[in-house]
Amino acid sequence: MAERGGESGAERGGDRGDFGRGFGGGRGGGRGRDRGPRGRGRRGGRASEETKWVPVTKLGRLVADNKITKLEQIYLHSLPVKEYQIIDHLVGPTLKDEVMKIMPVQKQTRAGQRTRFKAFVVVGDGNGHVGLGVKCSKEVATAIRGAIILAKLSVVPVRRGYWGNKIGKPHTVPCKVTGKCGSVTVRMVPAPRGSGIVAARVPKKVLQFAGIDDVFTSSRGSTKTLGNFVKATFDCLQKTYGFLTPEFWKETRFSRSPYQEHTDFLSTKAVSATKVITEGEDQA
């Protein structure tokens, strides 16, 4: 019986045994075979294509043209970073990110409770740069993606120092520093080389991303609130550049801003862009 059923299926043109070709197996069963990918496959292929970064800010144009090659040049003149691709271009290969927590949050409306997801993401290169991003969205993936972008936009420099003699590379915080968010207070104390990061799980991860090897920490308040705990740690690291030490007492020699140095480049680009727009309008 099985052989007869298989023969009947083969006679009908089917290659699946007794089931034939399914719907439309006899007439037009091969329609559209040579038309290439259709439906979701084609749409997914378009989404996977990498789009080239086209900078829209002055700083982005300078970075894309390799006029600025280090983040320190941006921090020195306090230039605002409005495009996350700038961070990717300068420290992209060494930058790591980690999702610290995803928590549901609710808002009461007339129609009922509206639930969204809040993501906390930390990024850092382990060499004196760290950022924190918080994003709320209807979907988890969208919240994580947005938090990563915000974390890159908020990357700040972390100042490192020594506990005793200045031997080797800086390994700890330069002095005692305190950060606060809500009821949570985090205090960091310099530690001798080899002590490691003496901290809870949440601040330890942030300190590792910042590139600090040895530090003593203490915290107080509602540290169970992870969001405030992370923000207090990030605030602590931000304040490492907020004080003057004897090495900064000498007279400061100011240098020109990148915008002033590359004025001709920026004006040329702007003029060429306006010419293209006007020519297109004239042709239309």
UniProtKB/Swiss-Prot annotation:
In Pfam terms, one family for this protein is Ribosomal_S5_C
S5 DRBM domain span: 95-158
Gene Ontology cellular-component annotations: cytosolic small ribosomal subunit; nucleus; plant-type cell wall; plasmodesma
Ranges of compositional bias, category Basic and acidic residues = 1-19
Q: Which GO terms describe its biological process?
A: translation
Q: What UniProt keywords apply to this chain's record, in alphabetical order?
A: Ribonucleoprotein, Ribosomal protein
Q: Where is the composition biased (Gly residues)?
A: 20-29
InterPro entries, A to Z: Ribosomal_Su5_D2-typ_SF (IPR020568), Ribosomal_uS5 (IPR000851), Ribosomal_uS5_C (IPR005324), Ribosomal_uS5_euk/arc (IPR005711), Ribosomal_uS5_N (IPR013810), Ribosomal_uS5_N_CS (IPR018192), Ribsml_uS5_D2-typ_fold_subgr (IPR014721)
Query: Region (Disordered): which ranges?
Result: 1-51
Q: Which residues form a coiled coil?
A: none
- Keyword Repressor belongs to the record: no
The GO terms this record gives for MF are: mRNA binding; structural constituent of ribosome
Listed PANTHER family: RIBOSOMAL S SUBUNIT, SMALL RIBOSOMAL SUBUNIT PROTEIN US5W-RELATED
* Family to which this protein belongs: Belongs to the universal ribosomal protein uS5 family.
Q: What is this protein called?
A: Small ribosomal subunit protein uS5y/uS5u/uS5v
User: Per the UniProt entry, what species is this protein from, by scientific name?
Assistant: Arabidopsis thaliana
